[in-house]
Amino acid sequence: MAKRDYYEVLGVSKGASADEIKKGFRTKAKELHPDRNADNPEAESQFKEANEAYDVLKDADKKAAYDRFGHAAFDGGMAGGPRGGGGQGQGDFASAFSDVFEDLFGDFMGGQRGRPGGARTQATRGSDLRYNLSITLEDAYNGLSKQITVPSSVACSSCDGTGSEAGAEPTSCPTCSGMGKVRAQQGFFTVERTCPTCNGMGQIVKNPCRTCGGAGRQEKDRALSVNIPAGVETGTRIRLSGEGEAGLRGGPAGDLYIFVEVQDHALFQRDGMDLFCRVPVSMVSAALGGEIEVPSIDGGRSRVRVPEGSQSGRQMRLRGKGMPALRGPGLGEMYIELMVETPVNLTGDQAELLRQFEESCKKTNNPNASGFFDKVKSFWDKVRD
């Protein structure tokens, strides 16, 4: 059966660049990988076909020969061809896939291939830590400096983080030759695993520190001072560089991340930089108008005029009475929402006065109620018809 055009196999044009050819192969490799196509018997042959095409097109000399002579350049019929006949062997097939193996799976494998000369050092960076800090809304408005206690691993005081007793030197791991990983060939794939002897460190401590057992660090609570800027909100993350766990055997420390949680407030609800406050007003004040006093987050008070005829839910804005910006100048707004309170626990005289008031009211005194009942009457009339 005639071979397919290599460019067609990879789904690229004949004028494709090296990056486009590599991208085309990566796409095909993911699509046709046997592990993803167990129920497709043709996938394996197509997978090999894609590898064969990439092995030629990735190489400038082979690509030039293919562009000039086609498949004849590699079938043994062209004297002086780049392969000299004989077809492609398994070594080239594995090599072709190896070129993009790290692109496909590099992040999963930790980004290290364990090539010769790439031996790992025993020093390993410490882990990052998370600390959840709960503060009040007032703290978020003003900002504060707070002392916290963080349980973490710190450099061992006995061995200064080396993991070895004084004067003892670690030796290269005999299992992985200092690589920290061992490799195993599985078909066309080379699989890397953490060395079971040194746990990926690449070195073995023959005379470990008695205090830390060779880890180079020990558990200890640390007191830290954290500066919380004004304007933070729930979810704000503050990074303290080098305040995480100590590194293994002299490695650099990780970072500490403070995650802020702002507590709910009894008076204010927050939306970004804006604050909302629901304020009850009497029925008389809402009807006749007047002034009310409202609190502000800075501890002060503000006088607010209630317009005549105000209804429940009416909002009024106080400029500059909200939360500060986390970065840069500026303050948000505070919105006052009126809640008209219906009187309760009335005396007989009070109830009678309200009845007299009700009898004296006209439709214009209660436009919403009048309009609503007019709509109800119209609805019932239509239902009867």
Swiss-Prot record:
Residues 5-70 form the J domain. Zn(2+) 1 binds at C156, C159, C209, C212. GO terms for molecular function: ATP binding; heat shock protein binding; unfolded protein binding; zinc ion binding. CXXCXGXG motif repeats lie at residues 156-163, 173-180, 195-202, 209-216. The keyword Zinc applies. Residues 299-323 are annotated as: Disordered. The keyword Phosphoprotein does not apply. Zn(2+) 2 binds at C173, C176, C195, C198. InterPro entries: DnaJ, DnaJ_C, DnaJ_domain, DnaJ_domain_CS, HSP40/DnaJ_pept-bd, HSP_DnaJ_Cys-rich_dom, HSP_DnaJ_Cys-rich_dom_sf, J_dom_sf. Signal peptide: none annotated. It is found in: Cytoplasm. GO terms for biological process: chaperone cofactor-dependent protein refolding; DNA replication; protein refolding; response to heat. Binds 2 Zn(2+) ions per monomer. A zinc finger (CR-type) spans 143-221. Keywords: Chaperone, Cytoplasm, DNA replication, Metal-binding, Repeat, Stress response, Zinc, Zinc-finger. One of its GO terms (cellular component) is cytoplasm. Homodimer. Belongs to the DnaJ family. The J domain is necessary and sufficient to stimulate DnaK ATPase activity. Zinc center 1 plays an important role in the autonomous, DnaK-independent chaperone activity of DnaJ. Zinc center 2 is essential for interaction with DnaK and for DnaJ activity. Participates actively in the response to hyperosmotic and heat shock by preventing the aggregation of stress-denatured proteins and by disaggregating proteins, also in an autonomous, DnaK-independent fashion. Unfolded proteins bind initially to DnaJ; upon interaction with the DnaJ-bound protein, DnaK hydrolyzes its bound ATP, resulting in the formation of a stable complex. GrpE releases ADP from DnaK; ATP binding to DnaK triggers the release of the substrate protein, thus completing the reaction cycle. This is Chaperone protein DnaJ. It comes from Jannaschia sp. (strain CCS1). The gene is dnaJ.
